[in-house]
Amino acid sequence: MLDAFSRAAVSADSSGSFIGGGELASLKSFIADGNKRLDAVNAITSNASCIVSDAVAGICCENTGLTAPNGGVYTNRKMAACLRDGEIVLRYVSYALLAGDASVLQDRCLNGLRETYAALGVPTGSASRAVAIMKAAAGALITNTNSQPKKMPVTTGDCSNIAGEAASYFDMVISAIS
C-alpha cells in the first residue's frame, strides 16, 4: 500500500529526480484536505454498523426472495455472513480513503472477490446493490447531507472531492463484484 507521500517518493525516484512540481502540488492538496479526510473516515467508521445493516435491510426489502427459503440471506448464518462482508468492504474503503490510495482495497479486499462470491453462490446483483446503498449513505455522511445530525465536530468546508473519492472506491467494489 502506498500513501500519498510514498507515491510521490516512488514517482520521483523512478524518474531519478527530486520531489517537486506536480508531486509537491499533490501533497499540498492532500495535506490541506487532511482534517476533512479524517472527518470523513470518522463519519464512516462511527456509523459503520448502521450503514451496513441499512444496506442489507435495503436489499432484503427490494428483493424479498433473499429472505425466502433458499434465498441469499435466508438463514441466520447467511445473514451474519452478509453483514460481516459488508463491514469488511466498508472497512477497506475507509482504509483507502484515509490513505488516499486504493491499493489496500485492491490487494486485500477486491482481489478474487467475484470468484469467491461465485463459489459461495452469493447473488452478485444483490451484493452490488448493497454496496451502492453503502456508497450513498457514506456520501451523505461525508457531505453532511444525511438526515441524522452527526454527534461529532467536523471541519467546515466543501467535502465533495473527498465524497467523490470515496464513491470511486465503492465503484471499484461494485465493479469487482459484477
From Swiss-Prot:
(2R,3E)-phycoerythrobilin 1 binds at residue 82. GO terms for cellular component: phycobilisome; plasma membrane-derived thylakoid membrane. Keywords: Antenna complex, Bile pigment, Chromophore, Electron transport, Membrane, Photosynthesis, Phycobilisome, Thylakoid, Transport. It is a peripheral membrane protein. It is found in: Cellular thylakoid membrane. Heterodimer of an alpha and a beta chain. PANTHER family: C-PHYCOCYANIN BETA SUBUNIT, PHYCOBILISOME 32.1 KDA LINKER POLYPEPTIDE, PHYCOCYANIN-ASSOCIATED, ROD 2-RELATED. Belongs to the phycobiliprotein family. This is C-phycoerythrin class 2 subunit beta. The lineage of its organism: Bacteria, Bacillati, Cyanobacteriota, Cyanophyceae, Synechococcales. The gene is mpeB.
